[in-house]
Curated annotation (Swiss-Prot):
This is Small ribosomal subunit protein uS5. GO terms for molecular function: rRNA binding; structural constituent of ribosome. Part of the 30S ribosomal subunit. Contacts proteins S4 and S8. Transmembrane segments: none annotated. Keywords: Ribonucleoprotein, Ribosomal protein, RNA-binding, rRNA-binding. HAMAP family: Ribosomal_uS5_B. GO terms for biological process: translation. One of its GO terms (cellular component) is small ribosomal subunit. The N-terminal domain interacts with the head of the 30S subunit; the C-terminal domain interacts with the body and contacts protein S4. The interaction surface between S4 and S5 is involved in control of translational fidelity. PROSITE patterns: S5_DSRBD. Belongs to the universal ribosomal protein uS5 family. With S4 and S12 plays an important role in translational accuracy. Located at the back of the 30S subunit body where it stabilizes the conformation of the head with respect to the body. NCBIfam families: rpsE_bact.
Amino acid sequence: MDVVKKSRNVHGANDFSELIVSVRRVAKVVKGGRRFSFSVLVVIGDEKGKVGCGIGKHLEVSEAKVKAVNAAKKNMIRVHLRESRTLHHDVKAKFCASKVMLRSAKVGTGIIAGGSIRLIFEVLGVQDVVAKSIGSSNPHNVVYAVFAAFKKMLSPKQVANKRSRKIGDIIENR
């Protein structure tokens, strides 16, 4: 049972906003019958370029969510943003059968993405982006594919070093 549920919590100490991507009820079959528990997938971010995802499992949904948030805090990555509103360059990535294409966009475009990809960009702080999910639409695989794409992205400094140029030349030519 996949439920895309939006709940935005901001914690005072770290200022992370968190969104629930999916809640699943899973069953373990034992001799006496079935034992039900819950699996929760959460994405958290500071809306300034840091984002993380985590899965939590427990008998209660609230406890599973707490575990997922703690796992997401341990799994945070930094994404370099252009003008604090969009991605620096286009990127493609794949995880299992899910493929994602993430493209930077002009000012005023908004977040053109569906499902769990939109939630990730909301907590990341991106305002203008175009994203496409191809293949499997399983929320877990799509989230992991987006994170694989983020890990493939290069900062302007890395691009400048690869091209043996100055950072200013890279940023001006956009």
